[in-house]
Amino acid sequence: MKVRRFAGVSARERDLVVRMTKRCLRELCKKEHELPVSYAEACEALTLTVKARSERSSGCRKGITIDVSAYRAGARTLLEYPAFASDRLIGSRVDAEPIAVLWGTVAHEVSHFIQYRYGPDTRWLAKTYRRAHGEGFRDIYRILRARVVNPLLGVESGVGTRQSAEP
């Protein structure tokens, strides 16, 4: 994984985002999800940029960019796009811990990376991966929210109980 840290981002914040990104990739690269890539290959392919500029975070086939400004400011709301904001599993959440909100942001952007990088070659994503927040993206994001993020938010997802938010 190539990691870029913009000025103003502490080593602690960078390391936190790196651990979160690796945890998300580790979950998605399990055999049960049938991605045509190993965890090591996915890490090698991803470029992670961490910034603190009060801008949007993003994800594409080359990598992800995470803005930690909201985490620093203590943001307690995980906002999602209107198309799925009211979804029980992947929708928006209010009154969450700032670290859980950062987990949600990282999971969202890792989902975009997997969607665009491996979607065309993955059996269950091949027909649905193209649309930015379409069904392919939602399927990937559901996996991460159910198994990684929602347990931190205290949301019942049928998988485990509330866990520590530290990676």
Predicted regions and their residues:
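Metalloprotease/metallohydrolase-associated module, dominated by Zn2+-dependent proteases
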Residues: 2-101, 117-167
